[in-house]
Amino acid sequence: MYGRTNHRTWPSDPVRTVMMWPVATVETLASMSAVAEALATDEIGALCVVENDALGGIVSERDVVTHLAAGANPAHLTAGEMMSSDLITVDPEDSVLAVARLMREAQVRHLPVVEDGLIAGIVSIRDLFDVLIDGASDEGEIVFVPSGARVVVRTE
């Protein structure tokens, strides 16, 4: 099973503290059915797609649903054909908050974490949400303004 670290994490902490490792992967030639089965079995939302041990893309539950809704045959469509290959990746030392902002800007829910060209982990918006909510409940209400400045309203 795939897991996360189980200690208190703050929005300013590096994303490596919340990323999933090991990373669930599939080969580019894996069928849509195999992708869906892996997502369901591991109870995860995305898989890294690899070819010759190199990261080629990411395929998510959203990709599977989109292709099925368009009438794709699960037996004939591969992970390589479904995956997003114009990848946005993050570094393990990027902050949780910076990664959350990047996900919002890119409108994605999962990002591979890459270090020295190798897959170091994967992070989901769900992982980040937990940290951001915990941080907000400890500090009071946190409001992010467009400039990126942070305004903290203390609750008494």
For the regions a protein language model found, what residue spans apply to each?
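Tandem CBS (Cystathionine beta-synthase) repeat/Bateman regulatory domains
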Residues: 1-156
